[in-house]
UniProtKB/Swiss-Prot annotation:
Single annotated GO MF: aspartic acid methylthiotransferase activity
Record localization: Cytoplasm
Domain MTTase N-terminal: 4-120
Gene: rimO
Name of the protein this chain belongs to: Ribosomal protein uS12 methylthiotransferase RimO
Listed GO CC annotations: cytosol
Function statement: Catalyzes the methylthiolation of an aspartic acid residue of ribosomal protein uS12.
Keyword RNA-binding part of the UniProt annotation: no
Length: 431
């Protein structure tokens, strides 16, 4: 039986979002209609996240809610796919017999067949966007070859596999023609792009060719600090449509912890990388991510992390408590920092970053900048600068005045005020 009305719930990161969008395009080609709500559908498909405990719990909660709908007769069928299934397929099958099928992260044809749809190789480049139409993500690789001790992604997604450049360019053309203005380049590790196929980094070559397509903004996310091709920073400085922004998760600075994490980099090398990137492009904004409460992290080691963050003054920073993941190598270590202490350390680090962010945002006050509008409501426009990625970074809150502003438009704005994580101002012109 072909599923005519399907509700797809996509959980987790932007990589998962791309997987869902690819599936949607294939299914729509077979006549399947996607609904806005579960109540309109006869089938539910949940694309799960299984990266950390909170994500697992959210996925389980959504599956159980969908099972209730099936038991009530609201829907006829229920399927589950994605990272959680990749890790716990057998356990899920045993505990959730009401689910009609479980699929991993590399079973797109099988999922489509279960839904009553056909897989078409020629449609692989096509996606039905779940993001607003003016920005999206380009996933340039699958899997990961790194062996970070805290991470289960290699088990979930497999070894690193760069997507063919020509396929990525075809996909990018389709996205550009659909109206996408901001292209966010992602994978588990963009630094390694090309190493598995060409024996060297091909990231800069790809970025140059994407830049030639005249996207308004191209942004780099998920760069690993080891093997990052520094020529990309020079290209960023030279090409106006490549955002002066780099997301490069460092996770920690203490040498003992970095070694235990198997990050392949030490504190001094991290500092040198930061300094080199900033020297090559003084206008760049750096985003990073830190982990607090890694097994054995002492108060002194955490204080060292605080000092590192204060000294290097990252433009954007996220911090997460260490999660003791069953399928990560660090699960063999004793998880000896209490949950309460982990949360306290996260809060302390983010309080420090709040002060850094406030200082950096204050520098924008009185200046005129270009903003991409994401949302408009009741005389206010909400958008981002080139220094802010969707969903995770700062937001600009702008009074529109007499200007007719719509999502997806670029505008000139004057910044009049700021908070640690927002800029406030007014629209003074349209681009």
């Amino acid at each position: 039986m072909t599923t005519h009305k399907l509700f797809l719930l996509s959980l987790g990161c932007s990589k998962n979002t791309v997987d869902s969008e690819r599936l949607m395009a294939q299914a729509e080609a077979s006549g399947i209609i996607f609904t806005e709500t579960a109540d309109e559908a006869d089938t539910i498909l949940i694309n799960t996240c299984g990266f950390i405990e909170d994500a697992k719990e959210e996925s389980i909660t959504e599956i159980l809610a969908a099972i209730d709908k099936k038991s009530e007769g609201t829907i006829q069928r229920l399927y589950v796919m994605g990272c959680l299934t990749e890790l716990y397929r057998n356990e899920l099958k045993e505990e959730m017999a009401e689910v009609d099928g479980f699929f991993g992260t590399r079973e797109l044809p099988e999922i489509l067949a279960a839904l009553g749809a056909a897989y078409h190789e020629e449609l692989y480049d096509h996606r039905s966007l779940l993001t607003p139409p003016h920005y999206t993500y380009l996933k340039i690789a699958e899997g990961c070859n790194r062996s970070c001790s805290f991470c289960s992604i290699p088990k979930i997604r497999g070894r690193y596999r760069s997507q063919p450049v020509e396929q990525l360019l075809r996909e990018a053309i389709l996205l550009k023609n659909s109206g996408v203005k901001e292209l966010n380049i992602i994978s588990q590790d963009i630094s390694m792009f090309g190493y598995d196929t060409m024996g060297k980094s091909m990231l800069n070559d790809l970025v140059l060719r994407l830049s030639d397509m005249a996207f308004d903004w191209i942004r780099l996310l998920y760069a690993y600090p080891v093997n990052f091709p520094l020529e990309v920073i020079e290209t960023m400085r030279e090409r106006e449509n490549i955002c002066n922004y780099l997301d490069i998760p460092l996770q920690h600075c203490n040498d003992r912890i970095l070694k235990s994490m198997n990050r392949g980099i030490n504190k001094q090398e991290s500092i040198q990388l930061i300094e080199t990137v900033r020297e090559k492009n003084p206008d760049i904004r750096l985003r990073t991510t830190m982990i607090a409460g890694y097994p054995g992290e002492t108060r002194e080691e955490f204080d060292e992390l605080l000092e590192f963050v204060e000294a290097n003054r990252f433009d954007r920073l996220g911090c997460f408590p260490y999660c003791h993941e069953e399928y990560a190598p660090s699960f063999a270590l004793e998880d000896n920092v209490s949950a309460e202490e982990k949360q306290d350390r996260v809060a302390e680090l983010m309080e420090l970053q709040e002060s850094v962010s406030q200082d950096k945002n204050r520098d924008f006050e009185g200046k005129e900048i270009t903003v991409l509008i994401d949302q408009v409501e009741e005389g206010m426009a909400f958008g981002r600068t080139e220094y802010d990625a969707p969903e995770v970074d700062n937001e600009c809150m702008l009074e529109t005045g007499d200007f007719q502003v719509e999502p997806g438009m670029f505008c000139h704005a004057r910044i009049t005020d700021s908070t640690p994580f927002d800029l406030v101002g007014e629209v003074i012109g349209l681009v």
